[in-house]
Design a protein with these regions (language model features):
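Conserved, single-site charged/polar hotspot
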Residues: 1-272
């Protein structure tokens, strides 16, 4: 469908198939709890809800795929609208939204892709993460649920990080130990509550937790201050964020993400 741009022109957006009937690669299995390096550099100091998610619209290795800066709630609503049906029971929608949010906040907390040298939070590939579709419509029943519980995630006793709650459709793909989307619909129709649905698939130790809210895009402190002359991935990450923000707030000068903290970067920081 056409999407209005700031210039007044329209861009033609092709919306691909929903994941429950389209053909997409199945999720590559991962451990639901990520190891923490002894240095502690892999994770943030606490679980937070970011204001913005940086979505890489492709597989991680596709350097030509675009990165989109998406408000967290809008991202979750988009993924849920792409992964499940809005006509399913509310308890099913809540359970699936919780799983989507917990998975996403695990990527945020562990800085999973940034620790691999990438400059994004999560991908739109179903093989690695969830399906996010640029420009798609959002369903009201899903939007209401996300607005109600957006600061929640799933935990296990003694585990600080949000659980990487993986799932599959349960018909074309089977995934023992994960939630199946069609199975969650069936349980919802049988009167199961959201936590009962989640415990049916992920086990009785799973529980719902709440995160702090935070503005911006969370990133762990690199162990040193970023000043004139500093270089590296953390500087490049800062520059990319400033450059994206400058497209909206024109008082902030654009910067080239070269990984070197020079005068142009310092000026952009001062304006910010």
């Amino acid at each position: 469908h056409p999407l209005a741009l700031a210039t007044g022109a329209e861009e033609e957006i092709i919306i691909p198939d929903h994941t429950l009937y389209g053909v997409y690669p199945p999720k590559i299995a991962e451990d639901e709890i990520k190891p923490v390096n002894e240095s502690g550099e892999i994770v943030l100091s606490r679980v937070v809800v970011p204001q913005t998610i940086v979505v890489h619209d492709g597989v991680p290795s596709n350097a030509s795929a675009k990165n989109y800066y998406v408000p967290y709630r809008d991202y979750i609503k988009n993924v849920a609208s792409s992964e499940i049906y809005a006509t399913w029971p509310q308890s099913t929608i809540v359970a699936n939204v919780l799983a989507i949010m917990s998975f996403t906040l695990n990527r945020v907390y562990t800085e999973w892709y940034r620790n691999q040298g990438y400059d994004f939070t999560i991908t739109s590939s179903t093989a690695f993460d969830h399906k996010w579709i640029f420009g798609r419509n959002i369903y009201e029943s899903i939007s209401v649920v996300v607005d109600d519980i957006f600061d929640s995630y799933l935990s296990r006793p003694g585990v600080k990080q949000p659980i990487l709650t993986q799932y599959c459709d349960g018909r074309r793909v089977t995934c023992p130990g994960w939630m199946t989307q069609w199975g969650s619909c069936d349980l919802g129709e049988r009167g199961y509550s959201p936590i009962e649905i989640l415990r049916y698939f992920y086990g009785d130790s799973i529980y719902i937790n709440n995160a702090e809210q935070i503005a911006g895009i969370p990133a762990s402190w690199p162990g040193y201050d970023l000043t004139i002359g500093t270089s590296g991935d953390k500087v490049r990450q800062l520059q990319e964020q400033l450059d994206a923000i400058s497209g909206i707030y024109t008082a902030i000068p654009g910067v080239v993400p070269d990984g070197i903290y020079g005068n142009a970067t310092a000026q952009a920081v001062r304006e910010f």
